[in-house]
A protein has these predicted regions:
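Sec-dependent N-terminal signal peptides
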Residues: 2-16
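Secreted/extracellular ectodomain signature
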Residues: 21-160
Length: 160
């Protein structure tokens, strides 16, 4: 019994630092507010970022896109669709038959499981638009680079 208690206590001590290393990110969709037919710009922030780092990267992207499009600082930004993320993965799927990604046809799914988040997004897109929609993935992203190799591998990497 004491061995079991020690084993559980040791495991809790090992896992606690892993859970403390939160990672943040954003999935942003920028659409030119002056021309809704303009191509969408999709941005994910870099992996393994703190909350402040990912927010700074998002703000730089939005401001840069606005500047390129000639949008003044007193006007509304084109970054209207922003998904904040913490310790998770995200996938964006869309119906290719509809002519491309639009803010109205994007299917966005979040999940801590990289291995399945893309399939869930595709399945939801197909459910919504049918096989004739020819659903496709636009992006799959995780806030932590360790998530790409799976949950068990992530835990092992953090323990090293």
């Amino acid at each position: 019994m004491i061995k079991k208690i020690l084993a559980v206590s040791t495991l809790c001590l090992i896992i606690a630092p892993v859970q403390a290393a939160d990672t943040y990110g954003y999935l942003a969709v920028w659409q030119n507010p002056q021309d809704e037919n303009d191509v969408l710009q999709i941005k994910t922030t870099k992996e393994d970022s703190t909350q402040n780092e990912s927010l700074a990267e998002l703000e730089a992207f939005c401001k840069g896109q606005d500047t390129l499009a000639g949008i003044g600082e007193d006007q509304a930004t084109g970054c209207r669709s922003v998904v904040p993320l913490k310790n998770t993965c995200v996938a964006l799927a869309y119906p290719k038959a509809g002519g491309g990604v639009r803010t109205g046809n994007a299917v966005v799914i979040t999940s801590p499981r990289f291995t399945s988040v893309h399939q869930i997004a595709l399945n939801q897109c197909i459910k919504k638009y049918g096989a004739q929609g020819q659903c496709s993935l636009e992006t799959v992203y995780c806030t932590s680079s360790a998530y790409y190799s799976g949950t068990v591998s992530s835990l092992i990497q953090h323990l090293k």
